């Protein structure tokens, strides 16, 4: 476990993120819960906690600096990625975690209770049925960018942003068709030898 903590500290340093030992313990406790539930409920395709550390925890932390304001909705959150990871980092920020799969929301309610994460609100619903105001609308491995936009455009205002976490495929053709201001960022994930990108979309003024 100390080796994993050291790896987290190194990743935080590379990402220029300040975190406490309590937060590091919370991230590890979260991953242990995810690994435990995964054996029964198939929460994620990644089974190994060491692999989860990089492909889930560090991948989620790599977009932390792009989160603005004080509220975020995580669309198709699955096992709570990136929402739970970011909620631990930003305890004053409210995260609404949305998924249509009941067992995943059941898991997230367990995470909320076990880790005393009062700034997450897991909701078992479809995103198109949700109403509310959020500073960030984020998705990771949820859908194509154009589908993400179509399902979430009712949240978009002049003051917030949509963030799509992507791999190598930036879906350039889909992006060109969207009536949005679009910025693309190459994301460096510590200990991961794979291309990761973030697409930030805002309403045209």
From Swiss-Prot:
Subcellular location: Cytoplasm
Reactions this protein catalyses: guanosine(527) in 16S rRNA + S-adenosyl-L-methionine = N(7)-methylguanosine(527) in 16S rRNA + S-adenosyl-L-homocysteine
Binding site for S-adenosyl-L-methionine: 76, 81, 127-128, 140
Pfam families tied to this protein: GidB (PF02527)
Domain of life (superkingdom): Bacteria
Gene3D superfamilies: Vaccinia Virus protein VP39 (3.40.50.150)
Main location (coarse class): cytoplasm
The protein's Enzyme Commission number: 2.1.1.170
Annotated GO CC locations: cytosol
InterPro entries recorded: rRNA_ssu_MeTfrase_G, SAM-dependent_MTases_sf
Coiled coil: none
GO MF term list: rRNA (guanine-N7-)-methyltransferase activity
Keywords associated with the record: Cytoplasm, Methyltransferase, rRNA processing, S-adenosyl-L-methionine, Transferase
Job of this protein: Specifically methylates the N7 position of guanine in position 527 of 16S rRNA.
Family: Belongs to the methyltransferase superfamily. RNA methyltransferase RsmG family.
Full protein name: Ribosomal RNA small subunit methyltransferase G
Gene label: rsmG
């Amino acid at each position: 476990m100390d080796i994993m903590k050291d790896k987290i500290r190194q990743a935080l340093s590379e990402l220029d993120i300040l975190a406490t030992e309590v937060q590091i313990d919370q991230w590890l406790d979260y991953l242990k819960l995810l690994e435990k539930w995964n054996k029964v409920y198939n929460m994620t395709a990644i089974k190994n906690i060491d692999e989860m550390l990089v492909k889930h925890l560090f991948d989620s932390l790599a977009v932390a600096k792009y989160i603005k304001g004080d509220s975020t909705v995580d669309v198709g959150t699955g096992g709570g990625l990136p929402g739970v990871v970011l909620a631990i980092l930003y305890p004053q920020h409210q995260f609404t975690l949305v998924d249509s799969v009941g067992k995943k929301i059941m898991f997230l309610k367990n995470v909320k209770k076990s880790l005393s994460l009062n700034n997450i609100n897991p909701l078992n619903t479809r995103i198109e049925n949700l109403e509310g105001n959020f500073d960030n609308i984020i998705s990771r491995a949820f859908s194509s960018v154009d589908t993400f936009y179509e399902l979430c455009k009712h949240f978009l205002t002049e003051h917030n942003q949509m963030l799509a976490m992507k791999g190598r495929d930036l879906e350039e053709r889909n992006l060109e068709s969207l009536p949005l201001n679009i910025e693309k960022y190459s994301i460096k994930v510590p200990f991961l030898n794979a291309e990761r990108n973030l697409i930030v979309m805002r309403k045209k003024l």
